[in-house]
Amino acid sequence: MNPPIASSELQQLADRIHAGQIILYPTDTVRGIGGDATNIKVIKRIIELKHRSLSKTMICLVHPDWIGRYTSYDVVGSYQKLDQYDVPTTLVVPILLGVLPEEMVREGTIAVRIPWSCDYLMSLLALLGKPLISTSANISGHRTPSRYEDIELSIIRSVDWVAPPSRDTGTHQSSRLIGVDGQVLR
């Protein structure tokens, strides 16, 4: 069991994200690289760090209290229909125009996940009040690391803040991906 994260630690992390820093952190799935999904400089830096194609979208972690600012789609209702809060699930949903940089949007949609099973992330997202980029902590095309020790040194050196290895919380596997039409994509 991981020690709880103090509210002062969460606030410091939220402040780092608001300041445009990139973090390496445990998610409800795998270790992720993230930052402010509304900040174009952060998005471009993450794309560059991962050597990622601009055509590949990134997931945003969101909070149920404010997801309505980004989509008119009933994200919370969709999770309730799935009735599997314990299985990390990413939904591809329509996005409201102009609320996120175009680098985060593909064909009018965005991939979002509410990390129900990860208390610290839910608290962090509530503090942030905006989406957090969540992409695996690897160079695009390389194996997704399941443990902190497997993360490439170039990734660790390229971010502004790294969560301690003792903070690992995830399932160590990618989330399930469900399209707007309910079709399982992954």
What role is predicted for each listed range?
Residues 1-186:
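Active-site-adjacent structural elements in enzyme catalytic cores
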